[in-house]
Amino acid sequence: MAYFNQHQSMISKRYLTFFSKSKKKKPFSTGQLIGLILGPLLFLLTLLFFHPQDLPWKGVYVLAITLWIATWWITEAIPIAATSLLPIVLLPLGHILTPEQVSSEYGNDIIFLFLGGFILAIAMERWNLHTRVALTIINLIGASTSKILLGFMVATGFLSMFVSNTAAVMIMIPIGLAIIKEAHDLQEANTNQTSIQKFEKSLVLAIGYAGTIGGLGTLIGTPPLIILKGQYMQHFGHEISFAKWMIVGIPTVIVLLGITWLYLRYVAFRHDLKYLPGGQTLIKQKLDELGKMKYEEKVVQTIFVLASLLWITREFLLKKWEVTSSVADGTIAIFISILLFIIPAKNTEKHRRIIDWEVAKELPWGVLILFGGGLALAKGISESGLAKWLGEQLKSLNGVSPILIVIVITIFVLFLTEVTSNTATATMILPILATLSVAVGVHPLLLMAPAAMAANCAYMLPVGTPPNAIIFGSGKISIKQMASVGFWVNLISAIIIILVVYYIMPIVLGIDINQPLPLK
């Protein structure tokens, strides 16, 4: 257990060191300083010199603030969450929306869905249920190196459907490093050292990649999918249900995990180490250290199952009853959260109830503000006439094969998100694609869904996504190795996303990909 804690501390230090090389911090990096100036400059230049005849002044104004906000999001000139507050100032100034209309977008149902999801995830982490679930999955799968690799991927992928990708990887990487240490300590005389090194690299990357892949399974698994749900509702007035997305997302996760596992085990890091000395023993030892499931764990497990059932059955059960017909996914998330605040804990030395307001310190408020900013900006784009104008300009793409557009969008976003925040990428790209769908005459989800899924899938660089930074911080993998392996996982993801969106999603969601929806 000491080794486990030691490595968790080591990862945190390396993770922080990666992002802060120098002790003497400058107020702005060169890139941030350029972005800080470029954003307002683009705003002014657009207002002064961009006046197309068929775009009203309000549309020009919203385009100008979109360029400003997008520039600050990409360069992170100021914190992304702070940039996301700009619509509250700029949209009323241009008489696009009233302050009340703008502010209401920051309290959208989608934001409360994610807030409730965060609270449930923190409850799992507080009472260590997440660790028990992960270790149990690994223990059940087996002791060969291939099965251990698969076990870690399944456990991490499952966790990241319900807790953040970052949290899932932070939970699993110390356990993985403990197994790697055990492999080195117990290696037999005839064991090839190169094989152990290949196994450790494959295991570290498997954990990071599975954390990213698993987020695609549910609407609360990763921010880009929450943004997809919100933008789709904002632009077209239609809803993506939690249950239906799981029918699309979970098979995608299973296929991606399976192919990535095969690639890591038999192509990228092929080795001769078939069984890991002491691997299964170590997992069982850690399970024994957890002891029997405690009261608080049972409560969180029950609440988790209840939340899942309510989300899954809302479309075909709750909507049929008059009393619950108006219940949304966010309503369920907050109901579940309130239950966690009410139910008392037995281990009162730690906490009086399952969750208390101390949880507020751990909640990612910045992410929630970013969602709100994206929704407010989307409403401004719609209300100002900018969305309609963009659609007219994009009509030149009419006649281009929809599958070709999907391929270009998926690959473009996949590689863009390697150097930009996945949340900011989705927030910027999805409103444009909503308009593009009308212009080219296809269903909006045909363009928006692959972009949101691709925005989540960054595998090449440590800066691409926090899970990548965490596994890089383990010291077991170099940037060059991550980039070369991640490039192929990017391409695998692109192929799977395109196939799922084009052939499976329309059947599951009951949509006609060649039938556009009118903008609200």
Swiss-Prot record:
Keywords: Cell membrane, Ion transport, Membrane, Sodium, Sodium transport, Symport, Transmembrane, Transmembrane helix, Transport. InterPro entries: SLC13A/DASS (IPR001898). GO terms for molecular function: organic anion transmembrane transporter activity; symporter activity. The chain crosses the membrane at residues 30-50, 55-75, 77-97, 104-124, 160-180, 207-227, 242-262, 298-318, 323-343, 362-382, 399-419, 428-448, 452-472, 491-511. The keyword DNA-binding does not apply. NCBIfam families: dass. Mediates the transport of the dicarboxylates fumarate, malate, and succinate across the cytoplasmic membrane via a Na(+)-electrochemical gradient. Belongs to the SLC13A/DASS transporter (TC 2.A.47) family. NADC subfamily. This is Sodium-dependent dicarboxylate transporter SdcS. It comes from Staphylococcus aureus (strain MRSA252).
